[in-house]
Structures are given as C-alpha cells and as structure tokens.
C-alpha cells in the first residue's frame, strides 16, 4: 500500500467513519455545562450546601468505598485526616469550614465514581449517574465557596485534584486538560514545585506536599496523553523529590525528623512505581530522533532502550521483587509497571521507524516481537480493567488508551495474511475497542476518526480473507505479566510491510 492511498483514506470525506451521534466531539451536556460556575462563579452560587450532606450511614459507606477504591491509588490525604473528616461528617457536618467541606464532597464524589452502577444502587439506593451529577455539582459549588481560584490552602488544592481525577468521562477530557493548567499554576503559587526541604518545613508537611505535586504531575501527563499533546509540567521546572516509600502510620504532623523509608511493599509503592515510569516517559521524550547510520541503528534509539532497561532493573530491585502476585494491589502494581515498560519499548521503536532514512528491511528480527508486544500491551491493559483483582480500581484504568499499540496492530493486520498471531491480534483489538467506544463512552477523543477509519479498512481486508475469529483471550493469563513480555513464536515476515500505514496514523495524531 502506498502512502498516497492511505492519506486519501484518511482525508476522504467518503471514508468510513463514525456517525454524527458517535462523533469524537460530543455535544455539550447539562452535566458539562455545570462547570462554568466552578471556574467563574455566579450570583446564584449556593450559600449553604447542607442539603447535600448525606445521612451518617451513607457517609460511612462512602468513606469506606473511598478507603478501598480510591485512597490506595490517590494517596494525597493522610488517613488520620480522613478519620477526622468522617467523625465530623457523621456528627455535625455544619461545623465544616468551607475548605474542608470542598474536600469532603470531593471524597464523596470520587467514592461514588469508583463504585459500579450495581453496587451504587444496592448500597446507596440511588442511580450512579444521578448521584454523580448531584455530588459533582456539590463539589463545584464547594470549590467556588472555598475560593478555589485564589486559594493559598493545600486542602483546597487536594479537593480540586481529587475532583479532576474522577472527571474521566470522554465529555470531561478537554475540561480536565484545561483545568490541570489552573491546578498547576496554583501548585506553583504554593511552591509545590520546590522541594519543601528548601523552606525548612516539617517532615509531615514536606511529605504531603511531595505527594500532591507528583500526583498533579501524573494527572498532567495522563490528560495530555488523552489530548495527544505535551504535558504542561516539564523536566527542569521542579526539584520536588519523590515521596518516601512508607505507610501512613509512619507519618504524623508532630514529627521533627522524617521517618526512615521501608524496604518492601508499602502503601506508597504503587504511586512510586507510577512516578518512576513517568520519569522514564519524560526522559524518553527528551531524546529526539536523529539520522540513521548505515546499519540502520540509531544512537538515540539505543539510548532509549538502555534507559528502559535501567528503569526496569531499578524497579525490580526496589519495588517489584517484593510484590506478592496473590495480593491484588501488588498484582496491579506489577502489571502497571510491565505494561508501561512494554509500551515505552514500543514507542521507542516507533520513533526509530519514523526517523528519516529508516530501512525496515534491516529490521527483520524485531518484526514479530513488535507485534507480539503490542498485542500484550492491549491484552494486559484490558485485564487491568476487567480482571477480578482490579475491580476496585478499574475506574482509574478506564482513562488508559494505548493507541500506538492499537494503531500499529491494525496497520499490520492490513498487510498480514491470516495466521494464529493475526487472530490473536484481532481478538485483542476488538476487546479493547469495544470498551473504548462502549457504554461508558468514547475514550478516543481526537484520535477517534483516524483510528476508526484504519479499523474499518483492516476489517474490510479481513472480510476478504473470509476467516472467522474466535473471541478468546485465553492466551493472556493474569499471572503471566510479572516475568515480562514473551518471545515471538511465529516465523518473521522479514520486514514491516505496514510501516507506511502506521506512520500516516502517527503523523495524523502525533506520537
């Protein structure tokens, strides 16, 4: 297939695409329009939110859901503080100041968002969508009342960050991406980008400020990936150290010396693994493409692979070797690390493939390995959402869209004959695609149209080959992720016949 043919496919108005109802730019809804008073305020901002406070029994349920489903992956609120909030919420909620009330409603909203519709109805006696809209409105009103845009208080920033972490629906993607800029500015105004050791702050405040800064950074990268743009926070903009590998019980406000770090898995390990992956991601982004030498290898490409290998070794030594895969949160941590490293390995290869002068015929030994790795990135990304071990935290992974692996596999399926590896690729592609554009909403955003067109083309070619595919994902077992990505088992194609197709998608979306 020639590049011109593929570009015609992407540019043609007659090309197969989504209907207007499924467009990647959703129409404004009543829910999304609520955000205006949150940012600017208006005269009808509620003077009291008393009617939004739930009965004590419901407060207990929501706090329990927050501790199980949200706190393990967004550890920006100290557990003793949670207990104090619950005590006040269930005894005399009118005693809350405006700042604490904003955090309280953010906790309620995130707890509801983390629950399945069935659990919401059974435990709270109300529809999840209705509750989400109700408490989102309460959060936005509370943030306005707390003076969010002018705040100098950490607790208000915690409330805003928690709120944005839960605004993961496709219609909120641009809103979150925009609001992260505001949150980042507020964080800078509070000096979170500077390590608190410069200011002589105590160990407790230092640690909580580090946790909040790094989670804002994680949220910035996540929202930017969804919009196919660069993060707003750049390396060199901050010197805030990583949080300590400790449990909340090791930390208290009256400490005068920082607690010693633990060896092994702690409550902070998952967050620290995500932060180390983030640092790797930013390092790889800084390594720009350059020319290819006569052997078809790029010095910077080798540097990328070396950086990935060094990160993998460091993660294994410091964190992953302590993971007990029979424990759910340990399994999630190990799986996130392996999938992220595999994705970084893929993207590094894709960057090499996009460099001027790249010769795919000099790359035969990597062909099937690239395909198999892309398949496993999709398979294990799917498992992170659907496996019983991750039920409590699946809401977080719904924002994970490894579109590069998805596009690469579809590009390969446009040129590959029917074979077991192709069948497995189609199963992985179909599984994740159904979730991305399923009942929870279209997650692909700006990437939707080119990926949809590419999928339609690959499906048409598949139909011509007249081979049914069994929708079976037995090849992806939950316990297989820890050792890493397997070796290819099929005969190599010899070269990447799909390169023109894939690179056109990359140029359309941006890698």
Where are these regions (language model features)?
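Intrinsic, low-complexity transcriptional activation domains
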Residues: 1-71, 94, 98-103, 108, ...
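Fungal transcription factor middle regulatory core
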Residues: 8, 15-30, 87, 118, ...
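Intrinsically disordered, low-complexity transcriptional activation domains
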Residues: 16, 394, 473-511
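Carboxylate/His-rich catalytic cores and anion/metal-binding grooves
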Residues: 59-143
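Short coil/turn linker motifs that delimit alpha-helical repeat modules in TPR/alpha-solenoid proteins
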Residues: 100, 152, 202, 209, ...
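Tandem amphipathic alpha-helical repeat scaffolds
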Residues: 108-114, 161-168, 222, 279, ...
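Long, amphipathic alpha-helical regulatory blocks in the mid-to-C-terminal portion
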Residues: 130-158, 162, 178-197, 215, ...
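Eukaryote-biased recognition of C-terminal alpha-helical segments
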Residues: 345, 409-412, 416, 432-489
